Design a protein with these regions (language model features):
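Condensing-enzyme catalytic core mediating Claisen C-C bond formation in acyl metabolism
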Residues: 1-25, 160, 215-276, 281, ...
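N-terminal extracellular/periplasmic Venus flytrap/periplasmic-binding protein-like
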Residues: 11, 23, 27-32, 168-253, ...
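Conserved beta-ketoacyl condensing-enzyme motif
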Residues: 22-85, 89-93, 97-98, 102-106, ...
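Short, well-ordered amphipathic alpha-helical segments that serve as non-catalytic structural scaffolds
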Residues: 26-41, 61-65, 90, 151-158, ...
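Conserved catalytic cysteine-centered active-site region
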Residues: 53-103, 145-150, 208-235, 315-344, ...
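Active-site-proximal alpha-helical scaffold in enzymes
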Residues: 64, 82-112, 159-189, 242-249, ...
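Flexible glycine-/small-residue-enriched beta->alpha junction loops
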Residues: 105-157
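Active-site pocket-lining segment
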Residues: 156, 263-332
Length: 402
């Protein structure tokens, strides 16, 4: 089975809904990022492109995006809809294809526009067309008999099940904002953000946040004893992000040093009433399969669409709580749905690189109760070079004298 590496990645800056990208179709946004990533590595086009997308108009946005980006028509491209986890699932699928030897280099990630999310209407012969409002923007995540499937209510139920208080959720939101602000000020992500349309700043980052402001934030649900507010839930966003996955052979033929090696992945079905808790369940399964403990990892990137996700992690894993979302998470940057998986993977690679880490995991909970996680190991340039030299030495034929 072939080894799979992450050569690197690029993302757009993340726009708020009806912000800087409000008129930009997701395939245009994603096409520019995909093209720039190929150009960065001197690549005309990959062997394939896999795109995550959750709220687009349908069709195959992956193929549309590829063509919008001016990449070769010979390159196959397809789209994955695993809601919030779509981009990370795209990376998972790309890794499997390279492991199997089908392709050598694949672009995987996602593109999303909450600003241009289309409205749909139930067909006349659908029993739901008789509803008072037959127009909808989001499809069902689980059957009606399971109860209300709204993500906000799922997060409230998860907070209650995990025993998360409003104060703990607000604390998680404040920490995320402070860490993201520092990362932005220090320019730690500067080389992986593609400036587009005259900007490179993530729009959702707040200029100031405090405990007092968090405490004054109004609740966003009528859930009894609910804890969710506009300040401890993520914004809805526009953005695109892609990573380049490649086989060892492809990288060595081009004398490229990868950022990380993919060491494993997991996808798990969980309680559909408590979707935010599925990310940590996926990580727990993955680490168990690999014989690892949480303490073996140097960084955890969880897509914290709701503060309950990060607050729950810190409550369960106190000894490694400081390793979660070291540069902030979705509570600060926002959540461009299908692009978020590649976005947090890019952040994870940069964190391991900057902080001399070895192992890290990216994880996302998805609507409907599916968790996705991908484990990576940072590649040290010196070790990569030494490994190549050892391989070269063993491959030199010996002169035999008779």
């Amino acid at each position: 089975m072939n080894r799979v590496f992450l050569a690197g990645g690029l993302r757009s800056h993340i726009g708020i809904r009806n912000g800087i990208f409000k008129h930009i179709r997701p395939e245009v946004l994603g096409g520019r990022v995909a093209r720039a990533l190929c150009q960065k590595y001197g690549l005309q086009g990959p062997d394939a492109l896999i795109c995550g997308n959750a709220v687009g108009p349908g069709g195959n946005i992956g193929r549309l995006l590829l063509l919008e980006g001016g990449l070769p028509e010979r390159v196959p491209a397809f789209t994955i809809d695993l809601q919030c986890a779509s981009g990370l699932a795209a990376i998972h699928m790309a890794a499997l294809s390279i492991m199997a030897g089908e392709w050598d280099v694949v672009l995987a990630g996602g593109a999303e526009s909450a600003s241009l999310q289309p409205q749909r209407r139930y067909a006349d012969n659908d029993e739901r067309s008789s509803l008072r409002n037959p127009v909808f923007t989001a499809a069902q995540f689980r059957p009606g008999e399971y109860g209300d499937d709204a993500m906000l209510l799922g997060a409230e139920r998860a907070a209650k099940a995990a025993g998360i208080t409003r104060e703990e959720a607000d604390e998680a939101a404040l920490l995320s904002q402070e860490r993201a602000k520092k990362a932005a000020e220090e320019g730690w992500l500067k080389d992986v953000i593609l400036p587009l349309f005259g900007s490179s700043r993530d729009e959702a980052l707040r200029k100031r946040m405090s405990e007092k402001l968090l405490a004054r934030a109004p609740r966003v649900t009528d859930f009894p004893e609910g804890i969710l507010t506009a300040a401890n839930t993520c914004t809805i966003n526009d953005g695109a992000a892609f990573v380049m996955l490649a086989s060892e052979r492809w990288l060595r033929e081009r004398d490229l040093v990868p950022s990380a090696e993919i060491k494993g992945f997991s996808m798990i079905g969980a309680d559909s009433a408590l979707p935010p808790l599925s990310a940590d369940l996926a990580v727990s399964l993955l680490l168990r399969e690999k014989g690892l403990f949480y303490s073996d990892l140097d960084a955890f990137e969880y897509n914290e669409a709701f503060a309950v996700i990060s607050a729950d992690f810190r409550k369960k894993h106190r000894d490694v709580a400081d390793r979660l979302n070291r540069w902030g998470g979705a509570l600060a940057y926002g959540h461009p749905y299908g692009a978020s998986g590649a976005e947090i993977m890019i952040h994870l690679m940069k964190i391991l690189e900057r902080e001399d880490g070895n192992l890290g995991v990216a994880a996302i909970p998805a609507a409907g109760g599916v968790g996705e996680a991908v484990l990576i190991h940072h590649v040290d340039e010196r070790e990569w070079t030494e490994e190549r030299e050892r391989h070269t030495a063993f491959s030199i034929p010996l002169e035999v004298k008779l």
